[in-house]
Amino acid sequence: MCTFSTDCCLPTLRYEISKLSLNLDKKLTTAQELTPLIYTPTVGEACVRWHEIFTQPEGMYLSFHDRGHLRQILENWPYNVEITVLTDGSRILGLGDLGVNGMGIPVGKLALYTACAGIRPEATLPLTLDLGTNNVALREDPLYMGSRMPKVSAEDEREFLDELMAALTDKWPG
């Protein structure tokens, strides 16, 4: 079990470190050493507690209620994106439906891509879709940051994803 002051904060710290462009390879020389710090198993605990440890946005959140405006909302992202990782938070590492708490997954995966593949952090877009959650405990938690509605239907989700893919391709065609 991680403690609040150490492991659970690592995804947030990782993002801050990547923004500062610190050189981690002097201390961590292999992906095997780095992965447990910024992804599995640390990211699972961070996702479970995301609504408790949240300090600032680490990516973009798009709500089901944003339908029809996704392309305009993407204009708010200040960087030229080369790679996006997205989640709807419904199936997080065997932990179940965590809704928008799943943001740790795209953040963590993109941290690995940055650390192991040399992708510039500013060229990444962690993206979480708030399409509701079937996790009643989360919907009732006063700290939960997502929509307090059940997950949308598969058909509605597909239509949302179609609009999103068109918007992403239009905004960043490369």
Which role fits each region the language model picked out?
Residues M1-G174:
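Metallocofactor- and cofactor-centric catalytic cores in central/energy metabolism, strongly enriched
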